Structures are given as structure tokens and as C-alpha cells.
UniProtKB/Swiss-Prot annotation:
Any one Gene Ontology BP term: regulation of DNA-templated transcription
Subunit structure: Interacts with the RNAP. Has a higher affinity for the core RNAP than for the holoenzyme. Its ATPase activity is stimulated by binding to RNAP.
EC assignment: 3.6.4.-
Gene Ontology MF term list: ATP binding; DNA binding; helicase activity; hydrolase activity, acting on acid anhydrides
Protein name (database record): RNA polymerase-associated protein RapA
Function field: Transcription regulator that activates transcription by stimulating RNA polymerase (RNAP) recycling in case of stress conditions such as supercoiled DNA or high salt concentrations. Probably acts by releasing the RNAP, when it is trapped or immobilized on tightly supercoiled DNA. Does not activate transcription on linear DNA. Probably not involved in DNA repair.
Family from the record: Belongs to the SNF2/RAD54 helicase family. RapA subfamily.
Positions annotated to bind ATP: 177-184
Amino acid sequence: MPFTLGQRWISDTESELGLGTVVALDARMVTLLFPAIGENRLYSRNDSPITRVMFNPGDTITSHEGWQLHVDKVNEENGLLSYTGTRLDTQEANVTLREVLLDSKLVFSKPQDRLFAGQIDRMDRFALRYRARKFQSEQYRMPWSGLRGQRTSLIPHQLNIAHDVGRRHAPRVLLADEVGLGKTIEAGMILHQQLLSGAAERVLIVVPETLQHQWLVEMLRRFNLRFSLFDDERYAEAQHDAYNPFETEQLVICSLDFVRRSKQRLEHLCDAEWDLMVVDEAHHLVWSEEAPSREYQAIEQLAERVPGILLLTATPEQLGMESHFARLRLLDPNRFHDFAQFVEEQQNYRPVADAVALLLAGNTLSDSELNTLGDLIGEQDIEPLLQAANSDREDAQAARQELVSMLMDRHGTSRVLFRNTRNGVKGFPKRELHTIRLPLPTQYQTAIKVSGIMGARKTAEERARDMLYPEQIYQEFEGDTGTWWNFDPRVEWLMGYLTSHRSQKVLVICAKAATALQLEQVLREREGIRAAVFHEGMSIIERDRAAAWFAEEDTGAQVLLCSEIGSEGRNFQFASNLVMFDLPFNPDLLEQRIGRLDRIGQAHDIQIHVPYLEKTAQSVLVRWYHEGLDAFEHTCPTGRTVYDSVHDELINYLAAPESTDGFDDLIKSCRQQHDALKAQLEQGRDRLLEIHSNGGEKAQALAESIEEQDDDTSLIAFSMNLFDIVGINQDDRGENLIVLTPSDHMLVPDFPGLPEDGCTITFERDVALSREDAQFITWEHPLIRNGLDLILSGDTGSSTISLLKNKALPVGTLLLELIYVVEAQAPKQLQLNRFLPATPVRLLLDKNGNNLAGQVEFESFNRQLSAVNRHTGSKLVNAVQQDVHAILQQGEAQIAKAALGLIDAARNEADEKLTAELSRLEALKAVNPNIRDDELAAIESNRQQVMDALAQAGWRLDALRLIVVTHQ
């Protein structure tokens, strides 16, 4: 094309330069000025990587003064173009804009503009863009979206609770599963769903101080949720950045004590507009009608301001009706306002629970039982269901299930309370205790005597704590020269046990980090035993490495030495041998230690070894735990209650372990109290609540569906394709592990979610569960989600040219592959993606406007095509520009019908689902006061907004590929 001064051109290789203007010419060279960056570039007149910028009628262009023109007509005179049309800001018609006055910062964003401007992408990027659109749209439509991405086993009762609660508007529930059933995981799954769907954006987690790191680790490791820990130091630091320090982060963890201590801090927390709050160990919130505790009042203040609340507690309601009521009162103060009325209501649920038990037993129902059911579900005609349930017909079981669902919907606290018990959930191992009684060394005896004389002023509790750890008493007197491990018989026993069980993995837990470190050194130096250490002084990454080394089967560590705090939040189901080098001070911590191995998914019975020194507090405690509470071999929900009731007596025995007069009687009375409480718990088991929390067959089916999805290989193929194109190196390490590292030629210099030093990934859930250092890649992982956003939010792959070698078609035949996106714009919290995610529609048009997409599948067609370099591609485009415009117009006419079909289907689905949910809850509200007015109002408002947003849905061209037939 001949050059003329004043013409506008664009660089094919440096599109960021904007529009260039021809400012000088000679026989062989042309000089372009790029005003946007104030630089000149020199190009050869022949075959340079630059493209003439020419707009067409229908385009909107911008002048260098900033106003826009809708082009009606294009004129050419002496090689220069001028555009005539309507000025958009003043609506003035027949305005002419010469090309030299076009805005130099022009960015081509429409696929067709990029194609005509010579901004042609690689063919593989176009294919990746289409796949990304397709997969993203499919993933949003999955019914279990938000439940697959976590690094957890697929346990039905957990999935059931998370699926039910995670989809609610601002859920306010009490999760009260027994110890070891995974309340933290359930809460994490609910958070993950709410954050992923946009229903929540700001989350606050309030936990006891000792559990802060456990939550931090669990949220990051299992759910890829990066929380910030707020303590006094962090709070003070953030005050420099914002008036309200809590507004500097979206996801925050802090301790209950931190919340309670300062009035100003509590006010800042209340003002920070959280969407969801999680409170762990909610049984620590003490309440009575006359005197609620400071902690309770602080959480109550927050609960009034935060729409969604998850309270977690392992304490069953039978051990304290009043405190159970207090927790429910936090969730819904209007519903739970009178304790006496609540107690009466609870007693009225007994006939409902009995009715459920009857239906589940499968026996024939008597007339009086049928009448009772009729009375309980009185507001609608259930006669046909009752007849079916009482017959031998095939649908009898289904009818009984439906009646159970109706009863559960209508009665009890089933919408606000979930509680699974070990009795109701199968799959737990047995626990076997082995106690090893060892003599107290003379060195310890002397140290204890001296300590008793010197510590006469200490309280009984301080002396009791000292007596639990004689090695520390000895070390205090001896200083750095003390080597307690040389004579402590527990060390000898441990070495003997480990050397005689070399093929077995053993978890050793002790109270203090120093003990763990000293034991590691002794085991390594004396016996060459491979031991990993795990304590609170290590970073999360160091702990991951230690855990991964312990998890390796052949070359890994035989033993993992953990301190009390260091082991929080970590589970090692692959090991079944637990050694307690010392004992913790209270039953909760004991259960927490055993809980590291005693989880669902543990394949073997757990062997618990307790080597203890006689005449120390350990010998007292081991008997009290085992004989008084049966706390080693069974979970002990009564432990805390019994411990609190005998606290002072027990402390005195621990402080002076040689004086055991009356200790047998104490053990006996504790055992009686424990048995009575346990019987009370068993008798008061709320079968109704357990059935509802467990989820039954529905939960099982959900777990199986997700497991099936785990086996889908399309994610692996897509991920590898994505990593290749983004420029991420992949190194296959075997055992289903791949190491990803950034390369020097990345699509973006800093890929979000990929650390500078890389990371190890796996696509296998089982591998991810046993290897804590490997990230579990699913469609919900930040690496994949960020990759999809990176490709789809920019123009990567939005315009390309390919050659089709096909002798059945004439040379030069044109095809245009158009990828349209049908979408609706709306705030994220409306979760429009459930009904109409950005959905790609593919058209493959020939010159006559025939759509061949139905006959020609994308992947097989893509394999037949070959790439064209950018320079040749630009020439091809210029030669067929008019034809492409004509085909594009035919595409616009055809997409409307397909898009409107998708939009109508989405509107019908949304209307049906949201109206059905609203009607169901409105009908139930008449008989179940646990349905909140604000929840109904939110569903109605949400339905209206969703319908309005879908009415505004539209479509746009997202990507196109020009295909030219060749015979070579």
C-alpha cells in the first residue's frame, strides 16, 4: 500500500505504542511518530510489521480532543481518510473527522478491530480462550459448585451440611458435631462456597487464642483461603493505614480475648461490615439471664451487626440447656427470647422424634400412630402419603422418607442446628490403650524435693503443672548442663519401641517444643532414627515440609515429634501409633491429641502408648483419664463437665502425687458421674436432628457425584494447556506430582497464585491428603481461577487466522469462526452464574452465512488447522476485509435467536427455582418459627433482582478466527 504523510498506522508487534502517524518518507524507508509515547520508529517501505488503520461505517472512533464519532461514511482523498458521522456528545450530524486527528492512545478491544488492525494472536491461544469460556460456564452450573476444591476427604455428612447451609442467604447456624467429625471443615466448606459465589466477601473468624494458628493453617491448606491474623501488634500497625484497622483486610482471624479486651476495638469490629462471622468453641460464651459474660456480650454485639453467623461447639445441649439456649439466642434473638418457653418447646418435640423413629423403623403403623402423624402435619392433606407409607407397595419407602422430611422441616431447630454423633456416622477406628509404668529416677526425685522447698509459695495449680513435667524441674536447676534424656526411662522405652517397630509410622506428642527438639537429637544421634519435628516456632512452610517427610512411605521419617500447640489443626490418618511422652492438663487437650489420628478415614485401630513415671502427676492423671473418664479408648463428651466439678480436688492430687488417700473414691465418683451423663446424652439423643444433619442417601449421592467429577481428565488437559501458554514450567516428579515454576517468558510477569520459587501440585485428592506440601488442583483452585481470569479478562486469543488444508473445497474459500458470549451484568452476590454464567455460543459461517458449527465439532476441526505468521495474516486480512465484514453482519443476525433462547431458559429456571424456594419457606413459616423474616425478604428481593438482571442480559463477540482454505 502506498504511504502518504499524515496516514495512521499501527505496529503489529508493539500494539502498546498506540496509533502512529507517517511523518517522513524516502525511497526505501518510512518514519512513524507515535504521539502516545512521543517516539519515532523507522520501518522499511516493503514488508514491515505495520498495518494501516481504517475504520468502517458503524464503528465508533475517538478524536484527540476526547469526543466520539459514530461513523456513517468513509472518504478517501490523496491516500488520506476522513470519517463522517454523528458526534455522540452533542448528537450533531454530518461531522467530519480527519484521520490525522484520531486519538493516538487507541486500543483495539473488539476482536474484529484487532483482526483488521493486524493484532493477530497465536492459534493455540484462541483455542485456549474458547475452552476457558466453555469450562468456566460449565463449572458454574454444577450443583455442587464450591464443594470440590477443598483438600478434604469426601465425607457425606460434612458435604450435606455444607451444601445445605452454604447456599443460604446469610446463614445463621449452630454446628455442634461431636469431636472428630470435622466442624472446622464444615465451616470452611460453607465459607468457601459463600466466597466463591459472591454471597460473602468479608469474613471474620473469632476463636480461642490457642486455636488461631490452627484455623489459619486449615483455611489456607484446605481451602486456599488466605486469612490475616489480627493481634495487638497487627491492630496497632493497621491503625496507620486506615481509620478502621479491620477494613485493611477482607478475611480476618482474631482471638476472643482480643475482641473482649478493648471497647474501641469491639466498636471497630462492629463497624467493619462483615458478611459472615465464625465463632469457634462457642461453649466458652457463658450466659445466664441475670449475668451474661463479657465474652458473650461482645459476640452478641457483633451478631447484631453481621448478617451471617456460624457458631461451632462440641458440647451437646443436654449438658447445659441454658447455655445451649444462649447460643441459639445469638443466632435469632427474636425467635429465642424466653428460656422457659424454649424448654417447654423442646419437650413438645418428643412426639415428633418418636414419629420419625416409627417411620424409619419400617414397621406397620397403627391407627393411633397414623392419627398422630396426621396431627403433626395437619395443614395439608397427607392421606395418600400415609396410605402409601403403610402399604407394601414399591413407593412405601419413598413415602416414608417424604413424611420424615416434612416432619423435619416443620419441627425442631433443624434449620439452625446441625449435630452429627459418632453413633450416627460410621467409619471410626477402635482405640487401644497401652500404659507403661516406669520408675522415677533419683535425679528427678532430688529435683522435685528441692523444688517443693523452694516453691512453697506456689499455688496448688502451679505445683500441679510442675509435677507433670519433672524433666523441666530438673533442667531448671541444672541449666544448660542438664541432660535429662540420658537417664529418663521414657527415652529408653521410646528408643526401644521405635527400633522394634521400624516399619511403622509413629506420632509422638509432648507438651513443650523444647522436649520435641531434644528427643529428635537423641533419636538421631543414638539410634539413627529418622525423626521430623513439628512445633509452634516453625513457619507454616517448615511444618508442611516436616509433615510431607513424615508422610513419605519409603524414604520418609519414621517418627514425627510434635509439641502440643504445633500439632493443632494437623491430622495424620496414615499413622495409627500414638505415643504420649507426657499428658496434657485437661480432657479437651487429650481428645485433641488422639484426634490427630482418630479421624474418619483412619484405616487401622489406634494404638495409644503412654509411658509414665510413677510418683508423679502423670501417674495420677493417667488413672483419672482412663478409670475415671474412659477418655483414652472412647471420645469423652462429658470430660469437661466432670473436670470442672472436681477441679480443686484433682489439682491437689496432681500437686502432691504421693498422697493418694481418697483418690480411688474420687475416681469412682467421677466414673459414676461420667456414666450418668453419658446415659443422659444417649437417652436425649435427638434422632430427628441426627437424621437431618447426616443427610442419609442424599449426602451419599452428593459425595459420589463429586468423586465422579474428580475422575474427569479434562481439567488436567486444560491446566497443562494453560500453563504452557502462560509460560509456566512443568516438571513431572512422578507419584502424580508436578512442580510448577515461573519462566522468563511469562504472559504476565507475576502470575497470581504462583510463588516465586514455584510450587508442587497434584490433581489426585488422595495424594493431596497425604502430601501437605502439594497443592490440590481443581476448577476451584486459585491457580486455575486466576488463569481463567487472566485469559478471559484481557484480549488473549480473541483474534486469529488459520489455514485449512482441504482439497474438497476451492482454494481461497473463507470461513469465519465466531465465539459469542451471552451474559448478564449484576452484583456478584446475586449469584447469576447459577442460571446464566457467561456462556459461549460458537458459529462457523461460510460466505453465504451457513452455520456449520453443528456438523463441525471444535476440537477435531482445530486439529485440522495450521497457523499463519502475523505478517502473512495481516496481508490476508487486508485482502478479504470486505468479505469478513459481510459474514460478521450475518453472524450478528444469527446469534440473536440462539442468545434469546439461552436467556429465556435462564429466566424460566430462575423464576421456577426461586419462586419454589420462597413458597416452600412461606408455607413452613406458618408451622416452624425458625424461618426468619429477613431470610424470606432477602429471597424475594433476590428473586426480583435476578429476574431484572436477566431481562437486561445481552451478548457480544468475544473471539473470532478467520479460516482460509489452501491446498498446500
